[in-house]
Amino acid sequence: MAKKVVGYIKLQIPAGKANPSPPVGPALGQRGLNIMQFCKEFNAKTQQLEPGMPIPVVITAYADRTFSFITKTPPNTYFLLKAAKISKGSQTVGKSAAVGSVTTAQLREIAETKFKDMNANDIDGAVRMLAGSAKSMGLNVVEG
């Protein structure tokens, strides 16, 4: 028989850096889950990734106070900022000059990495979604 699910917890945690401090500790503590066990398992699962890379995680809490979790690919903004070699997007999109640029080849590469977590039917659709995200961050999309 399947375990009874009591809730889902969605967090974004840096790869290999889960610890009991907020936001992880309070979120898991409210459901009565073992915080240290989660931190050890998450850090072990993400140790091969670039340290500090933000990893979205969905934790499923069960009635018997056990849990399971699924890691997803980092957010689009992380990849776009990395491709443009900048630290943050524009604060005034459309009013000031673009803060950087990304090529369509870079967008295609990001789309291939992110495709399984995106709500797109094909790679071209994913590229268009990423182009929209880039534009809203103040990045120019150039052919190449």
Curated annotation (Swiss-Prot):
Forms part of the ribosomal stalk which helps the ribosome interact with GTP-bound translation factors. SUPFAM superfamilies: Ribosomal L11/L12e N-terminal domain, Ribosomal protein L11, C-terminal domain. The lineage of its organism: Bacteria, Pseudomonadati, Pseudomonadota, Alphaproteobacteria, Acetobacterales. HAMAP family: Ribosomal_uL11. Part of the ribosomal stalk of the 50S ribosomal subunit. Interacts with L10 and the large rRNA to form the base of the stalk. L10 forms an elongated spine to which L12 dimers bind in a sequential fashion forming a multimeric L10(L12)X complex. One of its GO terms (molecular function) is structural constituent of ribosome. This is Large ribosomal subunit protein uL11. It holds the Pfam family Ribosomal_L11. Belongs to the universal ribosomal protein uL11 family. One or more lysine residues are methylated. SMART domains: RL11. GO terms for cellular component: cytosolic large ribosomal subunit. It comes from Gluconobacter oxydans (strain 621H). Gene3D superfamilies: Ribosomal protein L11, C-terminal domain, Ribosomal protein L11/L12, N-terminal domain. GO terms for biological process: translation.
